[in-house]
Amino acid sequence: MAEDADMRNELEEMQRRADQLADESLESTRRMLQLVEESKDAGIRTLVMLDEQGEQLERIEEGMDQINKDMKEAEKNSTDLGKFCGLCVCPCNKLKSSDAYKKAWGNNQDGVVASQPARVVDEREQMAISGGFIRRVTNDARENEMDENLEQVSGIIGNLRHMALDMGNEIDTQNRQIDRIMEKADSNKTRIDEANQRATKMLGSG
């Protein structure tokens, strides 16, 4: 009889311990799920900010392209005026053949870069998960929730990986665009400075 009582006590203790571990494991999966959801939200906010930054860079580069077009027109007018005044003060062709100009604008004189960087689109592969994530002991609702939580965690982690790839691709694209903008800005500044010098000479000669 005493042995039966001891065995019952041991079984009850094992059951109590199993329940305790199940409760702790359930809380652990809940915390994991909360953390990855917070990370997902942070990732989404970062992607939105990168997208907004990309739109701003597009507007800036369009502005550089418009300045390039305007300068072409101004240089043409300056050349015509110089011919009318009997002067030869427009080194426009020399400028356009310079390495800096070609680097900024390529061979397309309208300011559209010939080789635009292509965005890399990462294919989203959906992985089918067979079976559960945990080894069942109590086989109750807690383990069902644990399994569901871990499945969600796994899915969100996969999404976070793709987000990280998207961020890396977008940052690379924007870095290349910033380099182009800097080159175009330098080219535009040089042209404006030279246009001012030509205008000063023409006014002085008048």
Swiss-Prot record:
<keyword id="KW-0677">Repeat</keyword>
<keyword id="KW-1003">Cell membrane</keyword>
<dbReference type="GO" id="GO:0005886">
    <property type="term" value="C:plasma membrane"/>
</dbReference>
<feature type="lipid moiety-binding region" description="S-palmitoyl cysteine">
    <location>
        <position position="85"/>
    </location>
</feature>
<keyword id="KW-0597">Phosphoprotein</keyword>
<comment type="subunit">
    <text>Part of the SNARE core complex containing SNAP25, VAMP2 and STX1A; this complex binds CPLX1. Found in a complex containing SYT1, SV2B and syntaxin-1. Found in a ternary complex with STX1A and VAMP8. Interacts with HSC70 and with SYT9, forming a complex with DNAJC5. The interaction with SYT9 is inhibited in presence of calcium. Isoform 1 and isoform 2 interact with BLOC1S6. Interacts with CENPF. Interacts with EQTN. Interacts with HGS. Interacts with KCNB1 (via N-terminus); reduces the voltage-dependent potassium channel KCNB1 activity in pancreatic beta cells. Interacts with OTOF.</text>
</comment>
<keyword id="KW-0963">Cytoplasm</keyword>
<dbReference type="GO" id="GO:0031201">
    <property type="term" value="C:SNARE complex"/>
</dbReference>
<comment type="function">
    <text>t-SNARE involved in the molecular regulation of neurotransmitter release. May play an important role in the synaptic function of specific neuronal systems. Associates with proteins involved in vesicle docking and membrane fusion. Regulates plasma membrane recycling through its interaction with CENPF. Modulates the gating characteristics of the delayed rectifier voltage-dependent potassium channel KCNB1 in pancreatic beta cells.</text>
</comment>
<dbReference type="GO" id="GO:0005737">
    <property type="term" value="C:cytoplasm"/>
</dbReference>
<keyword id="KW-0771">Synaptosome</keyword>
<keyword id="KW-0449">Lipoprotein</keyword>
<feature type="region of interest" description="Interaction with CENPF">
    <location>
        <begin position="1"/>
        <end position="75"/>
    </location>
</feature>
<feature type="domain" description="t-SNARE coiled-coil homology 2">
    <location>
        <begin position="140"/>
        <end position="202"/>
    </location>
</feature>
<keyword id="KW-0770">Synapse</keyword>
<keyword id="KW-0175">Coiled coil</keyword>
<dbReference type="GO" id="GO:0017075">
    <property type="term" value="F:syntaxin-1 binding"/>
</dbReference>
<feature type="modified residue" description="Phosphoserine">
    <location>
        <position position="154"/>
    </location>
</feature>
<protein>
    <recommendedName>
        <fullName>Synaptosomal-associated protein 25</fullName>
    </recommendedName>
</protein>
<dbReference type="GO" id="GO:0070032">
    <property type="term" value="C:synaptobrevin 2-SNAP-25-syntaxin-1a-complexin I complex"/>
</dbReference>
<feature type="lipid moiety-binding region" description="S-palmitoyl cysteine">
    <location>
        <position position="92"/>
    </location>
</feature>
<dbReference type="GO" id="GO:0043005">
    <property type="term" value="C:neuron projection"/>
</dbReference>
<feature type="modified residue" description="Phosphoserine">
    <location>
        <position position="187"/>
    </location>
</feature>
<feature type="lipid moiety-binding region" description="S-palmitoyl cysteine">
    <location>
        <position position="88"/>
    </location>
</feature>
<feature type="modified residue" description="Phosphothreonine">
    <location>
        <position position="138"/>
    </location>
</feature>
<feature type="compositionally biased region" description="Basic and acidic residues">
    <location>
        <begin position="1"/>
        <end position="20"/>
    </location>
</feature>
<dbReference type="InterPro" id="IPR000928">
    <property type="entry name" value="SNAP-25_dom"/>
</dbReference>
<dbReference type="Pfam" id="PF00835">
    <property type="entry name" value="SNAP-25"/>
</dbReference>
<feature type="domain" description="t-SNARE coiled-coil homology 1">
    <location>
        <begin position="19"/>
        <end position="81"/>
    </location>
</feature>
<keyword id="KW-0564">Palmitate</keyword>
<dbReference type="GO" id="GO:0016082">
    <property type="term" value="P:synaptic vesicle priming"/>
</dbReference>
<dbReference type="GO" id="GO:0005249">
    <property type="term" value="F:voltage-gated potassium channel activity"/>
</dbReference>
<dbReference type="InterPro" id="IPR039077">
    <property type="entry name" value="SNAP-25_N_SNARE_chord"/>
</dbReference>
<dbReference type="GO" id="GO:0098793">
    <property type="term" value="C:presynapse"/>
</dbReference>
<feature type="lipid moiety-binding region" description="S-palmitoyl cysteine">
    <location>
        <position position="90"/>
    </location>
</feature>
<comment type="similarity">
    <text>Belongs to the SNAP-25 family.</text>
</comment>
<dbReference type="GO" id="GO:0005484">
    <property type="term" value="F:SNAP receptor activity"/>
</dbReference>
<dbReference type="GO" id="GO:0001917">
    <property type="term" value="C:photoreceptor inner segment"/>
</dbReference>
<feature type="region of interest" description="Disordered">
    <location>
        <begin position="1"/>
        <end position="25"/>
    </location>
</feature>
<keyword id="KW-0472">Membrane</keyword>
<dbReference type="GO" id="GO:0031629">
    <property type="term" value="P:synaptic vesicle fusion to presynaptic active zone membrane"/>
</dbReference>
<feature type="region of interest" description="Interaction with ZDHHC17">
    <location>
        <begin position="111"/>
        <end position="120"/>
    </location>
</feature>
